[in-house]
Amino acid sequence: IRHITAWDDDDRLINKSYSVKKGLLADPNFRAGFAELEKLNLSFDAWLYHPQIDDLTDLAQNFPGTTIILDHCGGPLGLGEYARASTNVFASWKKSIEKLAACRNVRVKLGGLGMRINGYDFHEKHLPPTSDELAKAWFPYFDTCIQAFGPDRCMFESNFPVDKGSY
């Protein structure tokens, strides 16, 4: 089961194609539905933004029997206020990832960092990024996830064609 919970105060970061509300992961009605997943032996894919990772950690701690898969490395944001605080964004994201990784029922998908919301300026360049440019840009995130979760709880993902939007 995948549910998009990606929400932020900045309206520019909200995808108008779907309805998302603040604090959804803590909502009692959401959690009542979430409780059914373990009974059905279903996993949960979480697509959210990095400021919401701590909410996902709380969910994982309260439902240790449900496998949770964090999509897109936890959605580190790089637009708006987050662009101006990129060093703080990485530090905050990393701290939250390490805390989430302590929950043994959580896995992480490595990918999805090519979206414009991640703040890379690839779409402003004349040519698409090279493999080396992508590897250099994404390495800190992939490395942190692999170190925190271990290789047994990491998986690669494709986010095509959405990632192509940034280049």
What does each of the following model-derived ranges do?
Residues R2, E36-D45, T67-I69, N105-K109, ...:
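Structural preference for beta-strand elements that scaffold enzyme active sites
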Residues F30-F34, L56-A60, K94-I97, F142-I146:
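Generic structural signal for well-ordered alpha-helices
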Residues L79-Y167:
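H/E-rich (His + Asp/Glu) clusters that bind or coordinate divalent metals
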Residues K39-L40, N62-F63, C103, A148:
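Alpha-helix C-cap/termination motif
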Residues I1-Q52, D58-Q61, G74, N88-V89, ...:
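Active-site gating/metal-coordination segments in enzymes
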Residues I1-I4, I14, I53, I68-I69, ...:
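Weak global preference for isoleucine
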Residues R2-G23, T66-T67, G74-G80, R104, ...:
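Active-site gating loops and adjacent loop-to-helix segments of metal-dependent hydrolytic enzymes
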